[in-house]
Design a protein with these regions (language model features):
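STAS-like cytosolic regulatory interaction modules
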Residues: 1-51, 63-111
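Conserved G/P- and acidic residue-centered "switch" motifs that form tight phosphate/ATP-binding loops
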Residues: 54
């Protein structure tokens, strides 16, 4: 996982591999510490290369979303893989994250 700032000031968190009990603490910490330290206008979580996500991964994304709302940061999930999109759809979270009901059309969500 890497974090970088775009020229427009948005923070991008690139996540790769699996989001499960073994890896989710690092994501949660990256999201929360970056939100509180940087207070970016937008945080983009790029999920292009996430191959698996369980309920712990979903929980970390929800935690990040809620923390972003508290700081007035726009929280965007970018390019969720078909598997990740399906997990979010099954749990009823696509609307909360501003995603369409079909994979491949992520929309930014403004809290």
């Amino acid at each position: 996982m890497t974090t970088r700032r775009q020229s427009d000031g948005a923070i991008v968190v690139d996540v790769r591999g699996t989001l499960d009990a073994a890896t989710v603490d690092a994501l949660r910490e990256a999201l929360l510490s970056t939100l509180h330290a940087e207070r970016p206008v937008s945080m983009i979580v790029d999920l292009t290369f996430v191959t698996f996500m369980d309920s712990m991964g979903i929980g970390a994304l929800v935690t990040g979303y809620n923390a972003a709302r508290e700081t007035g940061t726009r929280f965007v999930l970018r390019n969720p893989s078909e598997f990740v999109h399906r997990q979010l759809r099954v749990t009823g979270l696509t609307e909360m994250f501003g995603l369409s009901q079909t994979a491949g059309s992520a929309q930014p969500h403004t809290p």
